[in-house]
Amino acid sequence: MEKNGNNRKLRVCVATCNRADYSKLAPIMFGIKTEPAFFELDVVVLGSHLIDDYGNTYRMIEQDDFDINTRLHTIVRGEDEAAMVESVGLALVKLPDVLNRLKPDIMIVHGDRFDALALATSAALMNIRILHIEGGEVSGTIDDSIRHAITKLAHYHVCCTRSAEQHLISMCEDHDRILLAGCPSYDKLLSAKNKDYMSIIRMWLGDDVKCKDYIVALQHPVTTDIKHSIKMFELTLDALISFNKRTLVLFPNIDAGSKEMVRVMRKKGIEHHPNFRAVKHVPFDQFIQLVAHAGCMIGNSSCGVREVGAFGTPVINLGTRQIGRETGENVLHVRDADTQDKILQALHLQFGKQYPCSKIYGDGNAVPRILKFLKSIDLQEPLQKKFCFPPVKENISQDIDHILETLSALAVDLGGTNLRVAIVSMKGEIVKKYTQFNPKTYEERISLILQMCVEAAAEAVKLNCRILGVGISTGGRVNPQEGIVLHSTKLIQEWNSVDLRTPLSDTLHLPVWVDNDGNCAAMAERKFGQGKGQENFVTLITGTGIGGGIIHQHELIHGSSFCAAELGHLVVSLDGPDCSCGSHGCIEAYASGMALQREAKKLHDEDLLLVEGMSVPKDEPVGALHLIQAAKLGNVKAQNILRTAGTALGLGVVNILHTMDPSLVILSGVLASHYIHIVKDVIRQQASSSVQDVDVVVSDLVDPALLGAASMVLDYTTRRIH
């Protein structure tokens, strides 16, 4: 059993209200069903699933071999605003009995429907933990208000995009309870292959229809502007009639205004028109084949801007219902769809095109992440939510714990040579530091990290330091969201695809943050060093290798594949020396400690290194410091090597200035003071006049990697938690 606070199965209640949310919840339900050792699944069906006019879609849940524990008729017919409110009230009346009987540990709620609001309200008031799927997104209607209200009620959050994650954090939700998983439906979309898709197309659109020669239309009422949305639907149907292509029209959802939309369809004879097929529901497996092979999709459904991008099918998004959604290049927005001609022009522009597939909303691996997240939920944790508010002026009252304890972080620095662990205070003071040689194997390294952290945590208690979390700085490419080292440099062996967060979190029972050493150096400068208060700056860290970090608008830049700010691997020569990354001519191949050691050995082997006043003991390896000492004592060859190294670093800085235009460049690490004047000379000689005013300084921080690792913990906890 994975951690959930006790030794029994986690009882999960999945409540589904309509055909759309079932398409997102079904992959999770299938995943839960495959792990009976961990989970018990109860399925509650309500809303439009149970209405004949909307296809009695509860049947597809039964066809998927799920046992429906409870059916709740909660829809008050009328399809107007009052009916929606009454439906919420009816659900609130019926749900308590169901939840009292089922006694779930957690309820999974999806999206932004009024039914989901009733579910979340009931569960929250009955002290049942809530996992909200697809929180943090922005559309453009009352759905936004409902979605964000559910976010406030939910205890845990699964979001689909980085922007949604940032919205949740901005809404003061606890970052530890947010999972960026991607959309569950993408697990199915990206694996959907059906060689017999033409039989599906013919079944729904007729035997004479060809692939990419039909349209799928799905339009819903906009409850905040019903009259305008009805008019827009009428214009859409007129444009489709004029466009004269076979069209599959799905009936709208049950929101206020849907009855009027159906009247418009019948008034225009859509159900009997030879070019139209009007249907209440299409099973999701078949629906994705229909949109994947359509010439175009038109309407205002979230499906158009979210799921259809996985196939590159052209989409025409009408009106403002999805105005805030992130979309791929396959989506053409017609926000003011106020004339038939405008919609018709959009059809002519989009129909038949093929766009690149878009994975904005998922990579096909959401469900495994969600199941892992569910298993990690500790039922012994307090049920009451905590909100993480931005810093505010503290109360003048005092807290005895704050007086007696020093709020601190455990910081870990995994370098090419040494492994260091430190207790770092909120003010950036290193209270205690431990150093060991970095082992060569994965098993020895993980074991030593855990041992050193446990010892440091025990020492922190004696020193009256309250450890708030663990921050880890490591060489290589890091996914900070998952706490995984994706790919390391050659300096740290057996360090690819390494999950650092899980073993430390499980051992220490503390939150764990992980990032690249260059990024940590930049974060250290932002919190404790010369970057404090600077909006845009770049840090270059010189050590065994060369790393860096970029702060833009006060935020650290990670890049789309967590590869931003690999500044040591900027190429400054087409025929330069080989680099540890596998390329050649990189800054690191010239200016790193490794590069200087390489050149020092060459000089020493040729008896050209030592000058009067210096010696190297036989048992001491020749290194960069010997080269620097020789240069200081007048060794011209050593001086030339240092000048070449500094010039390479300077050229890299010039490239950064021309790309990022920062106001400040901070050189950090043991070699920074030896390079600073050369770098400034190169900027004067090579940089354009518009960027020459940049400040280039040497860091005054002694341990930037440790301080940066600590800052990940301390920055998070400076937000007041209530």
Swiss-Prot record:
The UDP-N-acetylglucosamine 2-epimerase activity, in contrast to the N-acetylmannosamine kinase activity, exhibits allosteric regulation by cytidine monophosphate-N-acetylneuraminic acid (CMP-Neu5Ac), the end product of neuraminic acid biosynthesis. Moreover, the activity is contingent upon the oligomeric state of the enzyme. The monomeric form is inactive, while the dimeric form selectively catalyzes the phosphorylation of N-acetylmannosamine. The hexameric form, on the other hand, demonstrates full proficiency in both enzyme activities. It is found in: Cytoplasm, Cytosol. The active site is at 517. ADP binds at residues 417-418, 420. Zn(2+) binds at residues 569, 579, 581, 586. Pathway: Amino-sugar metabolism; N-acetylneuraminate biosynthesis. SUPFAM superfamilies: Actin-like ATPase domain (SSF53067), UDP-Glycosyltransferase/glycogen phosphorylase (SSF53756). Bifunctional enzyme that possesses both UDP-N-acetylglucosamine 2-epimerase and N-acetylmannosamine kinase activities, and serves as the initiator of the biosynthetic pathway leading to the production of N-acetylneuraminic acid (NeuAc), a critical precursor in the synthesis of sialic acids. By catalyzing this pivotal and rate-limiting step in sialic acid biosynthesis, this enzyme assumes a pivotal role in governing the regulation of cell surface sialylation, playing a role in embryonic angiogenesis. GO terms for molecular function: ATP binding; hydrolase activity, hydrolyzing O-glycosyl compounds; metal ion binding; N-acylmannosamine kinase activity; UDP-N-acetylglucosamine 2-epimerase activity. It comes from Cricetulus griseus (Chinese hamster). Mg(2+) binds at residue 413. Residues 406-722 are annotated as: N-acetylmannosamine kinase. This is Bifunctional UDP-N-acetylglucosamine 2-epimerase/N-acetylmannosamine kinase. GO terms for cellular component: cytosol. Gene3D superfamilies: 3.30.420.40, Glycogen Phosphorylase B. In the N-terminal section; belongs to the UDP-N-acetylglucosamine 2-epimerase family. In the C-terminal section; belongs to the ROK (NagC/XylR) family.
